């Protein structure tokens, strides 16, 4: 169906979001058009503010509105462990269970030979630099249980083991192919408690 240009553009914009198909984008567009001007302005203001005010922590790579982020600034956290995750949503998932009290490092992707993504294409160099100047004795790899997650964890293990840093992986309470951000709290707690050395 042909829609007026402003609606078509709005549908196109919504459909660019991950997991949003044309039907959902159309629903969102029509819902937005039906909102009050104040609500639309508030939505647009919040969207622009998030885009403008958020950046990545210069230490761990987590999404933050201050640099360094609150987690890196918190001296009460266990400075001897770093949990490596794919993206900031995984940090939120781990923080929500309140079981892990160490530091984080966000990779912003995974090594994916099939997609041409190598170690230099993700946030690994800053991890190596960070480990040189720290008291970290254990790195916990918490990448998703996928082929790319496994490739990334094995690479990290190969690079860090010669430096004498213990490298562990979350236990396999997580189903193969599953994403950490969608795992329930009990599964994540057990995965941390029963992590295995790589």
UniProtKB/Swiss-Prot annotation:
<dbReference type="InterPro" id="IPR034137">
    <property type="entry name" value="TOPRIM_RecR"/>
</dbReference>
<dbReference type="GO" id="GO:0006310">
    <property type="term" value="P:DNA recombination"/>
</dbReference>
<dbReference type="Pfam" id="PF21176">
    <property type="entry name" value="RecR_HhH"/>
</dbReference>
<keyword id="KW-0234">DNA repair</keyword>
<keyword id="KW-0863">Zinc-finger</keyword>
<feature type="zinc finger region" description="C4-type">
    <location>
        <begin position="57"/>
        <end position="72"/>
    </location>
</feature>
<dbReference type="GO" id="GO:0006281">
    <property type="term" value="P:DNA repair"/>
</dbReference>
<keyword id="KW-0233">DNA recombination</keyword>
<dbReference type="GO" id="GO:0008270">
    <property type="term" value="F:zinc ion binding"/>
</dbReference>
<dbReference type="GO" id="GO:0003677">
    <property type="term" value="F:DNA binding"/>
</dbReference>
<dbReference type="Pfam" id="PF13662">
    <property type="entry name" value="Toprim_4"/>
</dbReference>
<comment type="similarity">
    <text>Belongs to the RecR family.</text>
</comment>
<keyword id="KW-0227">DNA damage</keyword>
<dbReference type="Pfam" id="PF02132">
    <property type="entry name" value="RecR_ZnF"/>
</dbReference>
<comment type="function">
    <text>May play a role in DNA repair. It seems to be involved in an RecBC-independent recombinational process of DNA repair. It may act with RecF and RecO.</text>
</comment>
<dbReference type="InterPro" id="IPR006171">
    <property type="entry name" value="TOPRIM_dom"/>
</dbReference>
<keyword id="KW-0479">Metal-binding</keyword>
<dbReference type="InterPro" id="IPR000093">
    <property type="entry name" value="DNA_Rcmb_RecR"/>
</dbReference>
<dbReference type="Pfam" id="PF21175">
    <property type="entry name" value="RecR_C"/>
</dbReference>
<dbReference type="InterPro" id="IPR023627">
    <property type="entry name" value="Rcmb_RecR"/>
</dbReference>
<dbReference type="InterPro" id="IPR015967">
    <property type="entry name" value="Rcmb_RecR_Znf"/>
</dbReference>
<protein>
    <recommendedName>
        <fullName>Recombination protein RecR</fullName>
    </recommendedName>
</protein>
<feature type="domain" description="Toprim">
    <location>
        <begin position="80"/>
        <end position="175"/>
    </location>
</feature>
<keyword id="KW-0862">Zinc</keyword>
């Amino acid at each position: 169906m042909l829609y007026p240009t402003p609606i078509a553009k709005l549908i196109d914009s919504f459909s660019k979001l991950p997991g949003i198909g044309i039907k959902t984008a159309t629903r969102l567009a029509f819902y937005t058009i039906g909102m009050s001007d104040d609500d639309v302005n508030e939505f647009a203001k919040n969207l622009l503010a998030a885009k403008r005010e958020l950046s990545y922590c210069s230490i761990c790579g987590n999404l933050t509105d201050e640099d360094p982020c609150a987690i890196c600034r918190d001296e009460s956290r266990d400075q001897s462990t770093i949990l490596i995750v794919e993206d900031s949503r995984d940090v939120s998932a781990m923080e929500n269970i309140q079981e892990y009290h160490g530091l984080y490092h966000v990779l912003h992707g995974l090594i994916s030979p099939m997609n041409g993504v190598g170690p230099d294409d993700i946030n690994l160099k800053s991890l190596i630099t960070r480990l040189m100047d720290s008291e970290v004795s254990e790195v916990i790899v918490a990448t998703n249980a996928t082929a790319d997650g496994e490739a990334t964890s094995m690479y990290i293990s190969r690079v860090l083991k010669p430096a004498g840093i213990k490298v562990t992986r979350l236990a396999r309470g997580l189903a193969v192919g599953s994403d950490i951000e969608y795992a329930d709290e009990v599964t994540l707690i057990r995965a941390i408690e029963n992590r295995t050395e790589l």
